[in-house]
Amino acid sequence: MEPMLGDRDGFRFRGGSLALDFTATLAARKREQTRELLETPRDLARWFAAAGLAVHKVNVTEDDLAAARALREALYRLALARVGGAPLPAADRRLLNRHAALATPAPRLDAAGVHWSRAETPALLAVIARAGVELLGGPLADRVRQCSGRWCAILFVDMSRSGHRKWCSMSGCGNKAKVATFRERNRTE
């Protein structure tokens, strides 16, 4: 599945990977108080739709929501381990692999493009988990980065030619950093 960058329905899609975009559903990770974007089962159903995984309404239970949050946090810790060059936590690998082993919905092509067959939450979480396995265990694993923005913890795949991208979004965090540097430079002159 090709990543769609940007913000949709209150969710940020800046990671360049479905798995990394899913980790952004817990916002403000670098602040004292995080902001949970998946507060209710309905929020998870909205995220599936915003991510392009579900065309039809998905029935999400409280148990599904708990499983989704656990998968999200495992993905986040695994990606941070990749960023830091640390070993991948075994418990998180087991959780990710357990989700990735589940059956996934089948993509189908129609006149408007690719759509996913109707699926339940575990199958959609399997799609996210497989994206995580492929990213964190594949050739782009060394291109996973964390935004250098002061308060931003978004993870992304650095697809820049040089491999030195610093921010999740040049128009957001990148611009803020450049403005702060400019102001600091002018203050000291």
Language-model features, listed with the residues they occupy:
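Short, surface-exposed, polar/charged, turn-prone segments marking secondary-structure boundaries
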Residues: 40-41, 49-51, 173-176, 183-184
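Amphipathic, soluble alpha-helical interaction motifs
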Residues: 81, 182-185
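BZIP DNA-binding basic region
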Residues: 127-180, 187-189
